[in-house]
Amino acid sequence: MTNNSPNTWQHLSSDWINWADRLAPAAEKINRHMIEAADLETLARLRGDAPLDVLDLASGVGEPAFSFARALAAPTGETTTGGGAANDAGPANSNDVSANTPHASGHVTASDIVPEMCDGLAARAAEEGIANISVIPADMENLPFSDQSFDVVSCRFGVMFCNDPDQALRESHRVLRPGGRAVYMVWAPMVDNPLFAAMDAVLGNILGIGFDQAGLDPFSFGNIDQSMDRMETAGFTGITATTHSPAGRIPEKVPFWKPQMDMLFGNVLRDASDMDRGAIDAAIFETLSPYIEDGHFQVPICFHVLSAKRA
């Protein structure tokens, strides 16, 4: 967001909490790309199999922090230490498919600029029994951590919403240990994301507010070359990027656009009339209807995963 203040996202925290559990399976699928890019097993070997410290930025109410915590969960009966914030939660969930990366264990410090998001994250971690995670409110442009505190810094769909994304990149570089890795998942351009294009057009037509009017710029890291240059300027080396375009298969009667729409525009939609809400849903359905095949929506999303090291 071009205005990365706690108040901006505080008004959306209830929407994020509302959808979190229902979106968890889909989140887990795309989070795997970040875990692979972090190359936890190789990093753990470089650290002599010592527990890794992971910092997740803009964690919202849990992802991808939960996925990283499961990937680094200690086998049953063992514990890991590291990282350092408050609000640790319950026993590890070793049944998740991403748990127990070979030769790697560790601790995740989840963070978000909105305290209410952090509270929701801590509650969900306790409910799911994730032990190797802690949570702390933090502004990624001014992190409350010492230099060289973490082995991995991760951020999914967050850095583009900062007031100063380049300062956020520099802060991530600062808190990484030498040889550590930063991994960012960012949206590709809107033209490659038909759901967002439909959302922007329909909300603009009916409510007079789209991404620009809301001060949102989800696509500012959409140009891979420019984004890699920004990471290099921040001090990172060994920068790589991959692009992913998955498409789900969702029954056409399911208004699958509501989670993303609520989590970005929930504060506006709550004031919309029932007539406007109905018109919005009808217009988005019509706009995305070319993606219906055999009674199912198959709408692609497109994102990049940027990965880099601190020398």
Predicted regions and their residues:
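A short acidic, Gly/Pro-enriched loop at the edge of an enzyme's catalytic core
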Residues: 141-152
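A short SAM/SAH-binding and catalytic strip from SAM-dependent methyltransferases
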Residues: 151-165, 188
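Conserved hydrophobic residues forming the short capping helix/wall of the S-adenosyl-L-methionine
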Residues: 72, 124-125, 203, 288, ...
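Conserved catalytic/acceptor-binding region of the Class I
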Residues: 166-167, 173, 177, 181-251, ...
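Conserved Class I S-adenosyl-L-methionine
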Residues: 3-9, 27, 217-311
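Conserved class I S-adenosyl-L-methionine
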Residues: 1-49, 63-67, 71, 120, ...
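Class I SAM-dependent methyltransferase SAM/SAH-binding core
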Residues: 53-143
